[in-house]
Amino acid sequence: MFALQGETMDTQQTIVVALGGNALGKTPQQQLALIQNTAKSLVDMIEEGYRVVITHGNGPQVGALKVSTDYASQHGVGPEIPFAECGAMSQGYIGYHLQQAMTNELARRNIHKPVVSVVTQTLVDAADPAFQHPTKPVGAFYSEAEAKKRMEHSGDVYVEDSGRGWRWVVASPLPTYIVETDTIKSLVESGCVVVAAGGGGIPVVKTEAGYKGVAAVIDKDNTAALLAHDIKADRLVILTAVEKVAINFNKPNQQDLDVINVEQAKQYSDEGQFAPGSMLPKISACVNFVQQTPAGEALITSLECAKQGLLGKTGTRIVA
């Protein structure tokens, strides 16, 4: 067991921390530099005595991998790699960067805790309506003629994207189960810092033969909430670009929120206070976690303010 000095496994709280894309950058080089700072904030939480599970986005990374393999395939210098495999590859190299940076930062502080990354599969329902209405553009841009040719051969859906060309679109189904849940829970209980469910997890469906990867994008915050509930975490922490959630955002009457309950969060969501592409999915994930874990709470804040947020000094807390 790897509990911190003065802590027991019974007194330590488990938190699931969802990193926003701003913590990772858009290229491997930028990511490696940014993650050094990210690691410091994460180790601050460990130093406070928390057991930490880290999830992260992978939008720019998986997109870059898909574009690269598409290009290689188009020019006859490499295979076209399926999207689920691109997701697995992104989990691998993001996990490697996080694992290495955190191991180094823990060593600098003389904290002896192993860090491990888990390639994670997330089960989705093959009958999820999202598969009938794919909306998430991924991969390379194509001409209209090439896109239509690919649609005829594959049955995939391509759409025109902002005048820049045609792109493949995939579904964004809801996560129902994380295949490696028990493994992640065991690692946490043994004292490991765990990086898991990157990019919302690799989407899989259940078939007669077992699990099978599918082309889809799962919202990372939804998966983080599911993971937090299933491993019985005490808190879900979603890190983003702002210190606090606000209503009337960017208006003269903007109001930062310190603590809101589930009903208030739902009311503000219904009023359209939260942008669908940014804050709304984070609020929804927090509501889902707190509804299923009434004794737990969720926190939304920035990476820089995470430690103070956990101490109740800043950030927005969502409670039952």
Predicted regions: what they are:
Residues 1-11:
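Short, Lys/Arg-enriched N-terminal segments with co-localized hydrophobic residues
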